[in-house]
């Protein structure tokens, strides 16, 4: 396919146009008075959201250079969302500000490499100040305040705080759709591990890219499965029972995997295969944990069990299993409560006996998965459109709250960035274009607060200047228009969110500034429509 190439200023400006189109659509959602964006869907009702990454994903541009610029910023939003669960809009606004200021300096003759180095040093300094200002979360009320800001709803915040309080920070919190109007919390025993499906063809919910089974059998094998002949006897028994099957094994490949996939596609038999978590002895221990939780047995030749001789009573069971590309969650395993309690006590004893910090950490992870359980938040709404939007908000708020528990919180509303920036730049000693690069960050850290003020109908420059000179932790409550102690007022952000947003935005900005050429696919011209054989006459 033919390519088109742009150089120098033309290349950078093309990328910037794409960035600006995307950022302008996303930034209107920032803050308590941010607006929503309506996303058209090819099928079904449109989605109404104020989530930066959801909006960014939907934007596709015609111009090839603008498209590349937009894709780079999508990466900022997606990476921030993956790491912290929130801060996507903040990251996009920061990226736009960094690129705008940076390109202005490049056009004025500054050295892009030195600018990038200056940006990186300034961002590192601001990040250190953010960490130093962090306040650890200790109470349920503080978790609720953080989750409430992300969800934009204090009721949801309280439910999330209750969920995290019950299952602990190591526990699992999932969100499901409810048939009722309200939002309620259900606590269920369960386990999650970091291995997903081995083939995308196992997916049962294409929109969420998940395989979800109710009342499923679980086959746990401590070896590799390649030969379908070994697997067929137990698969036949499961088909006759009318249930679905989750296979957890060292690996499933070759004709065994191919046969399972073909049967799923043809609708003959629903199954999903995942790799067992961990390695070596740790894998054996985790498989035994899963077996005890689900009431099954680990199929291993060392204990005299062969795959071809497996019967249904050796399989585990669970009320529900949810498998994504990265994770498997087992909810309400059919194991015996006494055996589970004994296993939990055994792991606690091992934690007490080990001298290795690494082993202790891994044992605590296993304990959390066995004993912590799963909290399920059931979201309800009047319409399907509202339900999707509400569910998405709750999922973001859960990850936001977990990030807060992990690294602590700082003043929200863009205040922490401005005030951390002020302290960082007083200490930075840079020269030449590196100092110019640091100054780009100095200007950019104001951008989130300015956008929040703009969305609230206030004068951005005046607000930013006033907040910069307020005591540490004090800033604008955009919901009321008052200047308050942000943490005392319950307006906070997890450090992880703010830090990730700044780091990811700076990373992309550095790429923009040091770009000297862009190579893109030449857009294909659509063929002219065929002529009307009737000559346009109405026969």
UniProtKB/Swiss-Prot annotation:
One of its GO terms (biological process) is protein refolding. GO terms for cellular component: cytoplasm. SUPFAM superfamilies: GroEL apical domain-like, GroEL equatorial domain-like, GroEL-intermediate domain like. Transmembrane segments: none annotated. It is found in: Cytoplasm. It comes from the Bacteria. It catalyses: ATP + H2O + a folded polypeptide = ADP + phosphate + an unfolded polypeptide. Keywords: ATP-binding, Chaperone, Cytoplasm, Isomerase, Nucleotide-binding. The keyword Ion transport does not apply. ATP binds at residues 29-32, 86-90, 413, 477-479, 493. Its EC number is 5.6.1.7. GO terms for molecular function: ATP binding; ATP-dependent protein folding chaperone; isomerase activity; unfolded protein binding. The keyword Transport does not apply. Pfam families: Cpn60_TCP1. Forms a cylinder of 14 subunits composed of two heptameric rings stacked back-to-back. Interacts with the co-chaperonin GroES. Belongs to the chaperonin (HSP60) family. Together with its co-chaperonin GroES, plays an essential role in assisting protein folding. The GroEL-GroES system forms a nano-cage that allows encapsulation of the non-native substrate proteins and provides a physical environment optimized to promote and accelerate protein folding. This is Chaperonin GroEL. It comes from Clavibacter michiganensis subsp. michiganensis (strain NCPPB 382). The gene is groEL.
């Amino acid at each position: 396919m033919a390519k088109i190439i742009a150089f120098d200023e033309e290349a950078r400006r093309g990328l910037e146009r794409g960035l600006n189109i995307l950022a302008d659509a996303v930034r209107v959602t920032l803050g308590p008075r941010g607006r929503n964006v309506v996303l058209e869907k090819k099928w079904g009702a449109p989605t109404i959201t104020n989530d930066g990454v959801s909006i960014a994903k939907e934007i596709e541009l015609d111009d090839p250079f603008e498209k590349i610029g937009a894709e780079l910023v999508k990466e900022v939003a997606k990476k921030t969302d993956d790491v912290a669960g929130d801060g996507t809009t903040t990251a996009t606004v920061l990226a736009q500000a960094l690129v705008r200021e940076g390109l202005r300096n490049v056009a004025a003759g500054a050295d892009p490499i030195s600018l990038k180095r200056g940006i990186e040093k300034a961002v590192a300094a601001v990040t250190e100040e953010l960490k130093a200002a962090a306040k650890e979360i200790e109470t349920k009320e503080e978790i609720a305040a953080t989750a409430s800001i992300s969800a934009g709803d204090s009721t949801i915040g309280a439910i999330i705080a209750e969920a995290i309080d019950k299952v602990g920070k190591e526990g699992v919190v999932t969100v499901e759709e409810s048939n009722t109007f309200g939002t309620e919390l259900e606590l269920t025993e369960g386990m999650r591990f970091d291995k997903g499906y081995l083939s995308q063809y196992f997916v049962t919910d294409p929109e969420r890219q998940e395989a979800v089974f109710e009342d499923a059998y679980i086959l746990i094998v401590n070896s590799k499965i390649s030969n379908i002949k070994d697997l067929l006897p137990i698969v036949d028994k499961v088909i006759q029972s009318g249930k679905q099957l989750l296979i957890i094994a060292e690996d499933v490949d070759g004709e065994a995997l191919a046969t399972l996939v073909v049967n799923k596609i043809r609708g003959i038999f629903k199954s999903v295969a995942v790799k067992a978590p961990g390695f070596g002895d740790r894998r054996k221990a985790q498989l035994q944990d899963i077996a005890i939780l689900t009431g099954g047995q680990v199929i291993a030749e060392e204990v005299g069990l062969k795959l071809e001789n497996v019967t249904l009573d050796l399989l585990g069971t669970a009320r529900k299993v949810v498998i994504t590309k990265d994770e498997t969650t087992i909810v309400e395993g059919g194991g015996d409560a006494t055996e589970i309690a004994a296993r939990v006590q055994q792991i606690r004893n091992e934690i007490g006996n080990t001298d290795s910090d690494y082993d202790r950490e891994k044992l605590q992870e296993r304990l959390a998965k066995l004993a912590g359980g799963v909290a399920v938040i059931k979201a309800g709404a009047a319409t399907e459109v509202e339900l999707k939007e509400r569910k998405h908000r709750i999922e973001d708020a859960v990850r936001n709250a977990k990030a807060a528990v992990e690294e602590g919180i700082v003043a929200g509303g863009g205040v922490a960035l401005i005030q951390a920036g002020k302290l960082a730049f007083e200490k930075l000693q840079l020269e030449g274009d590196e100092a110019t690069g640091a100054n780009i960050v100095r200007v950019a850290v104001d951008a989130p607060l300015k956008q929040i003020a703009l969305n609230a109908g206030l004068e951005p420059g005046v607000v930013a200047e006033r907040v910069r000179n307020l005591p540490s932790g004090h800033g604008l409550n955009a919901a009321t228009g008052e200047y308050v102690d942000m943490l005392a007022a319950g307006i906070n952000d997890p450090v992880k969110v703010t830090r990730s947003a700044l780091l990811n935005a700076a990373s992309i900005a550095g790429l923009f500034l040091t770009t000297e050429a862009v190579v893109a696919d030449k857009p294909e011209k659509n063929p002219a429509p065929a002529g009307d054989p009737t000559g346009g006459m109405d026969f």
